[in-house]
C-alpha cells in the first residue's frame, strides 16, 4: 500500500476548483489549501484572492457558456405583459440577499421610471425566499403597490430559466460581489444588454463596450456575509443604474449594439472548447512532467 501511495503521489495532482465572492479568502480554508497541489478558479478576481494566501499553482478557466436549448415557454407563460420593455434580475436567497442586492434593482427601476410610465416591467425571479421570511417581507414591502414589478419566488427547471432570460429585454445585477456571475454571462450569450456593478468576478467577461457597468464605492462588508472579516465589497451607485435602465429602454439602437457586442464577446471568451482546451493543456503538462 505504501508503494502504491508513493507512486500515485508522483503521478497524480490533487486539484481543487474553488469559488469565492470576496477579496479575502476565509482563514478556515487555509488548511484545505495545504491539502491540494493546485487550484482552479473561474475568474481573475478569485485568482487574486487566492494569491494572497498561497504560492501554489493556480489555473484560471472561465466558466463555459454553451448554446443550451430552453423550454420554449413564451412571455405569456411567465405572466409578462405584452409590449412592455422588461428587465430581469434572478437570484437565490441561499446565496445571501445582501450580496445579490435585489433592493437596489427595485430602487433603480423606480427612479428610472416614475409611476406614471407604464411601458416598462421588472421581473425579480428569486428562489428559496420562503426560507428567509424576514428578508422576503422586506423585498415585498418595496414592490407592493407597483404593478409594474413582478416578484416570482420559485424553483424552476434550468430550461425554463433560459426561456425567461430569452423573453426579457435587459438583465440587471446590482450585486455587491460575484465570484463569476454566470447568469449575467448567460444573458449576454443570448444577445441581451446587461447592466451590472462594475466590480468583482463579472469583470472576467464584462467590459465597457459589451455591457453597461455601474460605478460603485468599496465599503466594508461589516458582517453581512459569512466569513467576511476584513473584507470589502461594492456599493453600486443606484442613480447611475437608473440612468442606464432608462437609456436602454428609450434607445433601441444602443440596446441592440450592446447586446450584439455581448453575444460576440461571450461567444469567444466563454466558449466550451476554449475551457476544454485549457484543461487538456494543463493535464498534458502534468502528465509530461511526471
Named regions from a protein language model:
Residues 176:
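Aromatic "clamp/platform" in nucleotide-sugar-dependent glycosyltransferases that forms part
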Residues 134-163:
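Nucleotide-activated donor-binding/catalytic signature segment of Leloir-type glycosyltransferases, i.e.
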Amino acid at each position: 500500500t505504501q508503494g502504491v501511495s508513493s507512486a500515485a503521489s508522483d503521478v497524480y495532482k490533487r486539484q481543487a476548483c474553488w469559488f469565492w465572492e470576496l477579496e479575502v479568502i476565509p482563514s478556515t480554508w487555509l488548511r484545505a489549501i495545504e491539502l491540494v497541489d493546485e487550484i482552479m478558479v473561474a475568474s481573475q478576481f478569485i485568482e487574486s484572492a487566492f494569491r494572497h494566501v498561497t504560492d501554489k499553482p493556480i489555473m484560471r478557466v472561465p466558466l463555459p457558456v454553451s448554446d443550451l436549448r430552453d423550454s420554449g415557454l413564451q412571455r405569456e407563460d411567465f405572466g409578462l405583459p405584452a409590449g412592455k420593455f422588461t428587465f430581469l434580475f434572478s437570484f437565490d436567497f441561499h446565496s445571501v440577499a445582501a450580496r445579490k442586492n435585489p433592493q437596489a434593482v427595485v430602487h433603480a427601476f423606480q427612479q428610472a421610471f416614475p409611476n406614471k410610465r407604464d411601458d416598462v416591467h421588472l421581473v425579480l425571479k428569486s428562489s428559496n425566499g420562503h426560507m428567509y421570511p424576514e428578508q422576503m417581507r422586506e423585498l415585498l414591502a418595496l414592490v407592493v403597490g407597483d404593478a409594474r414589478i413582478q416578484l416570482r419566488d420559485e424553483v424552476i427547471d434550468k430550461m425554463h430559466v433560459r426561456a425567461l432570460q430569452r423573453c426579457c429585454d435587459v438583465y440587471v445585477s446590482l450585486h455587491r460581489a460575484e465570484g463569476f456571475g454566470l447568469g449575467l454571462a448567460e444573458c449576454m450569450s443570448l444577445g441581451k444588454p446587461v447592466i451590472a456593478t462594475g466590480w468583482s468576478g463579472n469583470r472576467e467577461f464584462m467590459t465597457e463596450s459589451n455591457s453597461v457597468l455601474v460605478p460603485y464605492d468599496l465599503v466594508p462588508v461589516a458582517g453581512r456575509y459569512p466569513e467576511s472579516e476584513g473584507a470589502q465589497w461594492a456599493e453600486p451607485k443606484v442613480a447611475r443604474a437608473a440612468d442606464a435602465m432608462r437609456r436602454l429602454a428609450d434607445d433601441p439602437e444602443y440596446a441592440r449594439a450592446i447586446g450584439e457586442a455581448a453575444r460576440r464577446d461571450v461567444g469567444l471568451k466563454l466558449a466550451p472548447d476554449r475551457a476544454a482546451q485549457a484543461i487538456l493543456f494543463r493535464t498534458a503538462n502534468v502528465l509530461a512532467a511526471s
